[in-house]
Amino acid sequence: MRLAIDAMGGDHAPEEIIKGSLEALKHFHDIEIVLIGKEEVLRGLQGKEKRLKLVYASEVIENDEVPVTAVRKKKDSSMIVGLELLKKEEVDAFLSAGNTGALMAGALLTLGRIKGIDRPALAPILPTLNGATVLLDAGSNTNCDAQNLVQFAAMGHVYAQKMFGIERPRVGLFNIGVEEEKGNEVVKKAFEELKKSKLNFIGNVEGRDIPYGVCEVVVCDGFVGNAILKSMEGIASVISQLLKEELTRNIFTKLGALLIMGGLKRITKKMDYTEYGGAPLLGIKKPVIKAHGNSKAKAIFNAIKQAKNFVDNDVLNHIKEEIESMGDELSV
């Protein structure tokens, strides 16, 4: 398996991207990594690792650039070069921690959408009390219609099925209440269609339900999804900081912390977003993974692991089969 990685994308590029990639090569012996970036940055890696290939790109798409404009103007950027390698089937998946909008625009323009999907969705995995849940969309589409939400549900169903090993993942529709009549017209229409579908739809779910793991797939538009994602990241960070402050307050709290250190480490690990890798762009014709913009080596390593699992489990073809089998159910 060959994975292409944008060495120039993200807040901590290129150092942390390179570090995470080299760590992945040590751990996974059945992968090759193609690092894409500026020659002056990557040249020193030449010959360092047998399964590491280098592809030079003269440009970088920055986080503050207008996505579509940057994609069209910077044809030799590390991001677009990586997507072109994927299009030519020279690699099996592409991963970037760079500009999210540019990655989505570039993927759409370069690779295109799966037949039957109107809009691709960003689908991160969130930690929950009972395991994890897939959230989609997490920021790609701020305005969605009911048909988009039903399509997200179908893709999320397959993704959770393959990544979590659950035959009938529970699908919940994010809303301001669990009652069927709650929400705007788009959400109400999506509820009706999901209820008629073959998916394991459990109804509406509220924000407080998500951390408890009431379902394996949470469906919403990208505006709401991004707010959920960032809120959960912030809460996890605050809880971690509060625990650290309280457990180091004095000698007695420090002694108590020693007694529960094992449990604390497990909790911290479970709530750490870097453990969950990146978010696939579901609905794109080829495997594209978006790593968190703030990713350091550990997060990049886990995003590579996720990309590998995505390809190993043939998630993309299973999504295509699911979309085809649901047919008219996806047309609202």
Curated annotation (Swiss-Prot):
Keywords: Cytoplasm, Lipid biosynthesis, Lipid metabolism, Phospholipid biosynthesis, Phospholipid metabolism, Transferase. Pathway: Lipid metabolism; phospholipid metabolism. GO terms for molecular function: phosphate:acyl-[acyl carrier protein] acyltransferase activity. Its main location: cytoplasm. One of its GO terms (cellular component) is cytoplasm. This is Phosphate acyltransferase. It is found in: Cytoplasm. The lineage of its organism: Bacteria, Bacillati, Bacillota, Clostridia, Thermoanaerobacterales. Its EC number is 2.3.1.274. It holds the Pfam family FA_synthesis. GO terms for biological process: fatty acid biosynthetic process; phospholipid biosynthetic process. It catalyses: a fatty acyl-[ACP] + phosphate = an acyl phosphate + holo-[ACP]. Catalyzes the reversible formation of acyl-phosphate (acyl-PO(4)) from acyl-[acyl-carrier-protein] (acyl-ACP). This enzyme utilizes acyl-ACP as fatty acyl donor, but not acyl-CoA. It comes from Thermoanaerobacter sp. (strain X514). Homodimer. Probably interacts with PlsY. Belongs to the PlsX family.
